[in-house]
Amino acid sequence: MALKFNPLVSQPYKLASSARPPVSTFRSPKFLCLASSSSPALSSKEVESLKKPFTPPREVHLQVLHSMPPQKIEIFKSMEDRAEQNLLPHLKDVEKSWQPQDFLPDPASDGFEDQVKELRERARELPDDYFVVLVGDMITEEALPTYQTMLNTLDGVRDETGASPTSWAVWTRAWTAEENRHGDLLNKYLYLSGRVDMRQIEKTIQYLIGSGMDPRTENNPYLGFIYTSFQERATFVSHGNTARQAKEHGDLKLAQICGTIAADEKRHETAYTKIVEKLLEIDPDGTVVAFADMMRKKISMPAHLMYDGRDDNLFDNFSSVAQRLGVYTAKDYADILEFLAGRWRIESLTGLSGEGNKAQEYLCGLTPRIRRLDERAQARAKKGPKIPFSWIHDREVQL
């Protein structure tokens, strides 16, 4: 890899493997869901004999369930009206929303073939490493069924029927509908570009959705909304940087595509951060402890279980390219933490319990600590090797 980071903060896209913090008062007793623990390497025959009819290529072996005390659910019931007033306005009317076709060649027009030719000519000017990052971002967006599933694991705010009229459920469905356009648009662009192996990309998407994700939010909406606040900010940054680099390479249409997606992510970030702001008003102690808990566990990116059927380190390798290009970096991770802590006024919280004060102290000292570690890592960094990516027909890209 191009960079190795201290365990305090993994590469921004990389799943961190840190020990869980001690049980805190904002949690109820934990229920652990255990799968098979680590074991010595087995032969391929032994592995095959142990497999079920279908086994995801990436499995999470330890998960914590329902860590929020049941009485805290009342907080989210009490926020229902506020959610309607403060959350739903951040959704856009479908009739006024952009659609993928607004940015792509029109297949019904006489000039369709010429438009595709122009798109492909612009795409030829983009380097392979840029396409690796753009494909990785698209695959992340295409795993949307997983993210709706994740939101519907959260106690007190899930869509109980699939068409629930509660504000929480309406938001989740409409947020999903807005996000759905992102993967559609990038997928169609990449298909038309002629620069990528669509079958390998489609396999990666299927593998990823089948594997799911483990954000370690524990069915707990405190943790869940902190996670989504961070994630929406991260995707805003990432798509914004791919937009900037597309412009630098002369593809103004692709820059517009990525910039439009980034604007959506920014709007969604605003909605999720408002939920956490309200939680800090109602339950500052529980919320600051939850924030510290998520940061101790580290924010794992949604596509951390990515696999293409070949590369066991695909996600790490994709992350290294994103880090090297400056699309999403350890510095961005620290910047997002600093932004959220400032937005939520963590430093100025008062009246906290002993545990809340410890969480506050930890959060206030974390950003400079991450920055110091990143600076040391960059000073020690060596040039990464070149490896093939199946997404771009096994052409080699430097990590």
Swiss-Prot record:
Molecular function per GO: metal ion binding; stearoyl-[ACP] desaturase activity
Descriptive protein name: Stearoyl-[acyl-carrier-protein] 9-desaturase, seed specific, chloroplastic
Disulphide bridges, residue numbers: none
Pathway: Lipid metabolism; fatty acid metabolism
Places the protein is found: Plastid, Chloroplast
GO cellular component, one term: chloroplast
Residues that hold Fe cation 1 according to the record: E141, E179, H182, E265
Record's subunit section: Homodimer.
